Amino acid sequence: PAPYSEISQVTARAVKDVQASRDQKELTQMGRAFNEQAQAITAQAIRAFLSRQHNERDVKTLQGLGIFPRSDRDGYLVLIHILRWEPTADHWEKQLLAVALNNIAAETFAVHSELSPIASVDEHSYAMLLQNTAGEEMDLEGIMRQLMYISNVAQQYLRCSMAFYLDDKLPVPKMPDLWEKLLHMQGENVTLRSGVFRLKEAPRQPHIFRVPQIRTWNTLLKDGYPEAVKQEAMTLLDEMSARGEMNADSLRSFYQDFMQMIYFTVGGSEEKIHELFYQPEALELYRNGMKSVDEMKALIRYVTSSWTEHKSVDESKELLDKLKQ
């Protein structure tokens, strides 16, 4: 038989391994429990933060876990206002609606590397904090377009209308001050008008087209040349791909410029944008347009098919040549 000292050492190692295994299982179980409750924990932290009743240590812990916006970076604060439910729609309990909104927002903003936790504040009000975590940061116009998309999804699937109140990005510690102003803005919406509303309408900076050719398509669509827009857009995508210029960033720029061009074409009318992307199939095209060249082409085909063709293809080509000159 082995000496007692060896048996003792082996036994001690075995006990240590068993204890380590138990500790690992406990940590795994704790991690799983936290993940299941992460949304609720973050929501509680948001409510406390906006009402200035938060514990700074708890906030820093959640920031370290990457589920709460960092205090040393700017972000956007959005008040989501549930306006009306359709007469035949089931009214969602606020916590379940918060889960649904979190899922929709995460799917919408994750492709832009935007953290987007949402917390229910009362039966009709929800707070969303947005902050870029990597890559190119979305501007206010981009944020507002994505909020319109969420509004369309809610109208289609949750069967309720919404209003969104926000302002330009600001340091996270200043968000409680802005929250009070957004609540006042919500209270002023006594007609329950849906849409995306800024706290103060500052003079808009002109959109800088990163794909300059797209800027001319606004005139083509307005004058009744959607077929020319489609042909030019398809050709441009193919040429950029052939030259090796097409990647995730350049496709995102193409998508954003194209959507901005559409926004200009309808005169900035949120109602017309809503009508254009109301159907589920259209919403999918809108959401997936920046994921691949094929998806972008499908979006272009849908948008241009929604405009009435007033001119012949030859006339469209002639005008396009003039615009290029």
PLM-predicted stretches and their roles:
Residues 107-108, 153, 235, 239:
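A generic secondary-structure signal
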Residues 15-18, 22, 109-112, 154, ...:
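Conserved NTP-handling cores and scaffolds of large molecular machines
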Residues 113-116, 120-126, 139, 155, ...:
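Cytosolic nucleotide-binding catalytic cores of signal-transduction proteins
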Residues 3-142, 169-175, 179-187, 194-219, ...:
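Interdomain helical linkers/hinges and coiled-coil/dimerization scaffolds
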Residues 162-168:
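A short glycine-rich, hydrophobically flanked beta-strand micro-motif that places a catalytic Asp/Glu
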Residues 202-324:
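Alpha-helical bundle regulatory/interaction domains
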Residues 134-158:
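GGDEF/GGEEF active-site signature
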Residues 12, 102-106, 147-155, 183, ...:
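Generic solvent-exposed, charged/amphipathic alpha-helical segments
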